[in-house]
Amino acid sequence: MIHEAPQVTVSVVDGPCIAGGFGMACAADILITMESSYFKLSETKLGLIPSQISPYLLNRMTFSKARQLMLLGDDLDGSTAHSIGVADYLAHSYEDLYKVISQIKSKVMLCSPNAIAKTKSHLSKARNIDIQRSSQLFFECINHDEGLEGLQSFFEKRDPYWAKSK
């Protein structure tokens, strides 16, 4: 698991970051996004629940904002993701991106690997992330009729039966 790695982990988002990819990006210690990127949680539109990734999302934004994104499937652009705390750094160009990565690398190289590992372990326990419960909720949804329909409609490139047109 990304969040359990003893090293500092960095996610770079350059383009669409949707559903589980959004959660994986949020699981990293540091998240850098390009201004042109966008983030989206589409699970509820597929009859699923973003439960397995919710602990990581809740570590990066307010509960209220996470609830809105999870329930409605709204998009966040890179700038908004940065302004609400999803992303730690916002890069406007690849030159900016490489500068930020270089700065982070330089800072990490000054830190004790053991101290980083112990700090990460301590922070994880302090947040009490219940991945097993989150996984169980996802399993329940994916095995429900609506979860199966949502996945089938996704692969068939059509709306699920409950999606009403505007």
Regions found by a protein language model. Name each.
Residues 65-74:
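Short helix- or helix-capping micro-motifs
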Residues 1-46, 75:
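Glycine-rich beta-to-alpha active-site loop
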Residues 69-70, 122-123, 137-143:
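Helix-loop "lid/cap" segments that line or gate small-molecule binding pockets
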Residues 55-64:
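Hydrophobic, secondary-structure "cap" segments at the distal end of domains
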Residues 32-37, 87-133, 162-166:
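C-terminal long alpha-helix characteristic of the crotonase
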Residues 74-80:
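Acidic, divalent-metal-coordinating active-site segment for phosphoryl/phosphodiester hydrolysis
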